[in-house]
């Protein structure tokens, strides 16, 4: 058996050290572990008939709580001073040890004490904690009790209690408390507390809402300094307890303050917060006492984090859906429990989202519309002034708050919480039609396996007399004015079976419907386990497309006519810089390409470790996205140059808009290559991977925002993360159905223009204003320095504060001045007026969120005047530690919860010693640690 350890020594030693209790009182010999069986109630000590061993009813693990009694004294009739035998599967500790270590918050926070399975016996005044992972389900709180007379008044007992090793001498008369009755638990009669406390659980999806009555009793032993002394055995109903609990008195009072004279007033206030917030239980009573019960992390990973904390100590049950355990909006202050397994997963997620289908068809088309190479000039300017700083801002906000876009913006600036909701709405609208492109890719992918691809010639049943096969080089023949290529007719007549316009919706395309269902099935099964499942899929879907892009680019630059296409791509026309549309297109492509202001980057960063290097990730994602856009541009314009040579026309005349760029132009070019089937299969598989990467991110930001914003509704109606993902996928699929009818391509083009392009710059402007101006560039810089150890550069801060907002506002105003209604097929089809009304309705879905949520938060805010309400809605909801001023620190969660509970106690229960509670409200937790004599003398505040 190991030697005895001092409490303070144990709290500062390694977890492998063991606390061994002193020998039990005379006549009580402790049992060995081998003597403690798993059946019924039996004697805990040799010769002690009244000691009980109670086994819980847990179905997952056996929970043992030892109820000792004084030899020869029936339960409830005498003070208990005997030791508490310790079982490894129990959570046992001492109030005295916690009282002794109250002034050492850091050891309590960062040190774990555990015992090995042996015959140790717990004496009052010593610490025992344990390591096992066991489920606890029986509602039991048992303490030693004093005599009670018929009126319920406590009779002081004269039993002597041996002093613990490290505590001062214990007063000979134990503190007293009224006693009531005996209850039955697990078939054994147990003397329990006179105090009934109602335990309200607001846990999460793993723990159903419950109201369990727990009988508790304060030990009633104090030393000469007023510190609480006594053994405690505890189990809590409904809590999954993978780690032990320790009990920490928040205010140490003398024994006299334990007396109660009114039985009706003997109620204990209890508040259980989420398991994610240290599974803490704040308990206070009518005389100002309060206890906080917390879990002590003891797993290998948690111990390593406590010794070498790279991130804040893990807070709660490690589970895939732990963020569903939030009970209210205050739970959003806690960091997200789930994290990326490694940094590569996060980087691949960001790259996979930013490098999507927009790089393949939108970038070449925008470059073509903006005069070729001159487009790269405003594109790079906006990239370095707006896009990169905004990406860094989004990653910082997501990583710091640990929330999705709605929760993050709501914490930093509640008035602009609607900007986060608007981003989620835009992402949801995109998910409804973005999946259609994935469906097209699936259709083309399987069609490419045919021996002869159907878009090569005009000998198919869907071809029309206008079908014209481009002539080989050397033949001077131009296409007729009404001609259509085989790939164009295959896409419109076979795949889409396109109608005459939006006013002619037509029938459902069942082949596309099947492809759409396949696309959503892949999205669902890749995201149903949140980032743990999608991150594994991205190892392939986010890397393999780059291999294919390089292969296709190398093949394209070797085609005849590629030089002419590259000349169009890289040769700028400087006069086009005066055209406002060039800047508008460059800004739109920047935001669509990098994926900023859609909420996905904030959502991804919320799963980061707290000290992740954000700047490095920002540079990596931006650089890869820029390089990929250039590679795709080289591939696209080399292909267009070859097509222009084949058709004996200009590069400007062969490019298509919208999805036609990738499903008309590219297939036609690859049909002329050797091994056409191979190149087609590779190309459409690349499109499939790129589309899935983007769709994963879009679905994840919607799911994350729903779970962060409506945890109670989700817990009540859906329950599991898989059900939430299924719900989002089904709803998005249903809203995407109009895109796969015969007139769906017109609807697709309308949605793409109004849902994303029109609103995206306004959302980016509002986001920069909310974070950089109202939350403050200084605050954000401080947050970044707290996370990474280095503050943002002057360049980033100036872009956040001045350059970025000004440039965004100017481009947004220019876009309104130079606004043009969308068309289809390069102006061949013009939408009816009512279609534009539908488009603006889609745009308003996101835009109205910003003023709407601002009004709601204003009406909900406190304040007597208009400006007081405005100030309150602009005030961040992020808690800053009163000790160090930081959000994530070793003082944060205990400080916050204890201080808030002290304030709640002041409003609900009138304390016996108001001066003590007032000191607690002024000074925070430290004043609450002191005894009344200490507090009245000035306490930690020196007042």
UniProtKB/Swiss-Prot annotation:
Transmembrane segment boundaries: 346-366, 373-393, 418-438, 511-531, 539-559, 591-607, 618-638, 679-699, 723-743, 754-774, 799-819, 836-856
Cytoplasmic side: 1-345, 857-943
Signal peptide: none
Tissue expression per record: Expressed both maternally and zygotically. Developing embryos exhibit expression in the posterior hindgut, foregut, midgut, Malpighian tubules, anal plate, Garland cells, and a subset of cells in the central nervous system. Central nervous system expression is seen in segmentally repeating in cells flanking the midline of the ventral ganglion. Isoform A and isoform B are colocalized in both the nervous system and the fluid reabsorption system.
Annotated region described as Disordered, given as residue ranges: 103-122
InterPro entries: Na/ntran_symport, Na/ntran_symport_inebriated, SNS_sf
Domain of life: Eukaryota
Keyword annotations: Developmental protein, Differentiation, Glycoprotein, Membrane, Neurogenesis, Neurotransmitter transport, Symport, Transmembrane, Transmembrane helix, Transport
Gene inactivation effect: Flies lacking this protein, in a wild-type background, display no observable behavioral defects. In a Shaker mutant background, flies lacking ine exhibit downturned wings and an indented thorax. Flies lacking ine exhibit increased excitability of the larval peripheral nerve by causing the defective re-uptake of the substrate neurotransmitter of the ine transporter and thus overstimulation by this neurotransmitter. Flies lacking ine increase the growth of the perineurial glial layer of the larval peripheral nerve.
Location of the protein in the cell: Membrane
Primary location class: membrane
GO cellular component, one term: plasma membrane
Glycan-linked positions: 476
GO BP terms in the entry: glial cell growth; glycine import across plasma membrane; multicellular organismal-level water homeostasis; neurotransmitter transport; perineurial glial growth; regulation of response to osmotic stress; response to water deprivation; sodium ion transmembrane transport
Topology of the protein relative to the lipid bilayer: Multi-pass membrane protein
UniProt cross-references to PANTHER family, sorted A to Z: SODIUM- AND CHLORIDE-DEPENDENT GABA TRANSPORTER INE, SODIUM/CHLORIDE DEPENDENT TRANSPORTER
Family that this chain belongs to: Belongs to the sodium:neurotransmitter symporter (SNF) (TC 2.A.22) family.
Role description: Plays a role in neuronal membrane excitation, important for normal response properties of the photoreceptor. Able to control excitability from either neurons or glia cells. Ine negatively regulates neuronal sodium channels. Controls neurotransmitter-mediated signaling pathways associated with the structure of the larval peripheral nerve, ine and eag control perineurial glial growth through partially redundant pathways. Isoform A and isoform B are both functional, although isoform A functions with greater efficiency. Has a role in osmolyte transport within the Malpighian tubule and hindgut.
Protein name: Sodium- and chloride-dependent GABA transporter ine
The organism of origin for this protein: Drosophila melanogaster
């Amino acid at each position: 058996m190991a030697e005895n350890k001092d409490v303070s020594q144990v709290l500062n030693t390694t977890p492998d050290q063991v606390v061994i209790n002193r020998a039990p009182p005379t006549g009580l010999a402790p049992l060995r572990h081998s003597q403690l069986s798993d059946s019924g109630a039996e004697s805990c000590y040799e010769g002690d008939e009244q000691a009980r061993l109670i086994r819980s009813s847990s179905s997952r693990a056996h929970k043992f709580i030892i109820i000792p009694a004084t030899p020869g004294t029936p339960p409830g009739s005498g003070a208990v001073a005997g030791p508490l035998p310790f079982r490894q599967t129990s959570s046992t500790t001492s109030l005295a040890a916690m009282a002794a270590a109250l002034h050492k918050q850091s050891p309590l926070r960062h040190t774990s004490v555990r015992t090995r399975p042996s015959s140790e016996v717990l004496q009052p005044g010593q610490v025992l904690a344990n390591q096992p992972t066991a489920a606890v389900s029986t509602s039991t709180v048992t303490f030693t009790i004093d005599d009670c007379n018929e009126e319920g008044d406590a009779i002081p007992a004269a039993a002597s209690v041996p002093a613990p090793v490290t505590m001062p001498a214990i007063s000979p008369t134990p503190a007293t408390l009224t006693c009531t009755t005996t209850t039955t638990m697990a078939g054994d009669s147990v003397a329990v507390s006179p105090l009934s406390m109602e335990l309200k659980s607001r846990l999460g999806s793993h723990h159903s809402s419950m109201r369990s009555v727990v009988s508790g009793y304060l030990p009633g032993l104090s030393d000469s300094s007023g510190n609480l002394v006594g053994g405690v055995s505890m189990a809590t109903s409904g809590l999954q307890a993978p780690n032990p609990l320790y009990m920490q008195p928040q205010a140490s009072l003398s024994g006299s303050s334990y007396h109660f004279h009114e039985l009706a007033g003997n109620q204990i206030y209890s508040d259980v917060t989420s398991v994610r917030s240290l599974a803490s239980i704040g308990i206070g009573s009518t005389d100002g006492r309060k206890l906080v019960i917390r879990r002590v992390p003891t797993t290998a990973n948690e111990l390593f984090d406590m010794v070498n904390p790279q991130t804040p100590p893990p807070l709660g049950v490690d589970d895939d859906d732990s963020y569903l355990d939030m009970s209210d909006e205050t739970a959003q202050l806690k960091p997200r429990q789930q994290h990326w397994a490694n940094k590569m997963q996060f980087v691949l997620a960001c790259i996979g989202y930013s490098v999507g289908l927009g790089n393949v068809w939108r970038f070449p088309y925008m470059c073509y519309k903006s005069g070729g190479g001159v487009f790269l000039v405003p594109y790079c300017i906006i990239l370095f002034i707006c896009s990169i700083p905004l990406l860094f801002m989004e990653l910082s906000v997501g990583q710091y708050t640990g929330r999705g876009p709605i929760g993050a913006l709501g914490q930093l600036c509640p008035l602009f919480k609607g900007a986060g909701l608007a981003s989620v709405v835009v992402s949801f609208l995109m998910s409804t039609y973005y999946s259609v492109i994935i469906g097209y890719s699936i259709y083309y992918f399987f069609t490419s396996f045919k021996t002869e691809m159907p878009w090569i010639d005009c000998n198919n049943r869907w071809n029309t007399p206008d079908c014209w096969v481009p002539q080989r080089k050397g033949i001077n023949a131009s296409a007729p004015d009404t001609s259509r290529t085989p790939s164009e007719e295959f896409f419109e007549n076979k795949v889409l079976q396109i109608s005459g316009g939006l006013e002619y919706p037509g029938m459902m395309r069942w082949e596309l419907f099947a492809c759409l269902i396949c696309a959503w099935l892949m999205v669902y099964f890749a995201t149903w386990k949140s980032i743990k499942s999608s991150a594994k899929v991205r190892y392939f879907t986010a890397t393999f497309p780059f291999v294919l892009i390089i292969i296709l680019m190398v093949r394209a630059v070797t085609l005849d006519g590629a030089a002419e296409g590259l000349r169009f791509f890289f040769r700028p026309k400087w006069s086009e810089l005066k055209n406002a549309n060039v800047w508008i297109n460059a800004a739109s492509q920047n935001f669509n390409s990098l994926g900023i202001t859609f909420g996905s980057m904030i959502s991804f960063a919320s799963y980061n470790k707290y000290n992740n290097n954000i700047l490095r990730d920002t540079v990596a994602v931006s650089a890869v996205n820029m390089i990929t856009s250039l590679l795709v541009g080289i591939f696209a314009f080399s292909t267009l140059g070859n097509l222009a040579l084949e058709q004996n026309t200009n590069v400007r005349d062969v490019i298509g808009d919208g999805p036609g760029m990738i499903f008309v132009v590219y297939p036609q070019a690859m049909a002329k290559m050797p091994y056409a089937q191979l190149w087609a299969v590779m190309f459409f598989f690349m499109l499939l991977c790129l589309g899935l990467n983007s769709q994963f991110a879009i679905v994840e930001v919607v799911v994350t925002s729903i779970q962060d914003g409506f945890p109670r509704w989700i817990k009540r109606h859906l329950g599991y993360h898989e059900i939430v993902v299924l719900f989002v996928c089904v709803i998005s699929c249903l809203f995407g159905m109009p895109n796969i009818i015969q007139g769906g391509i017109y609807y697709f083009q309308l949605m793409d223009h109004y849902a994303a392009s029109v609103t995206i710059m306004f959302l980016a402007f509002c986001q920069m204003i909310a974070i950089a101006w109202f939350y403050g560039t200084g605050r954000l810089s401080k947050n970044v320095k707290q996370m990474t150890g280095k503050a943002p550069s002057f360049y980033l801060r100036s872009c956040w504060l001045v350059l970025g907002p000004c440039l965004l506002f100017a481009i947004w105003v220019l876009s309104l001045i130079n606004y043009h209604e969308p068309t289809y097929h390069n102006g061949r089809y013009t939408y009816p007026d009512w279609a534009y009304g539908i488009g603006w309705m889609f745009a308003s879905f996101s835009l109205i969120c910003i003023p709407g949520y601002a009004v709601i938060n204003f009406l909900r805010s406190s304040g007597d005047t208009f400006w007081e309400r405005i100030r309150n809605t602009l005030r961040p909801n992020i808690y800053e530690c009163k000790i160090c001023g930081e959000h994530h620190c070793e003082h944060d969660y205990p400080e916050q919860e204890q201080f808030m509970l002290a304030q709640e106690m002041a409003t609900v229960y009138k304390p016996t010693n108001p001066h003590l509670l007032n000191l607690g409200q002024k000074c925070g937790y430290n004043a609450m640690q002191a005894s009344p004599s200490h507090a009245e003398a000035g306490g930690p505040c020196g007042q």
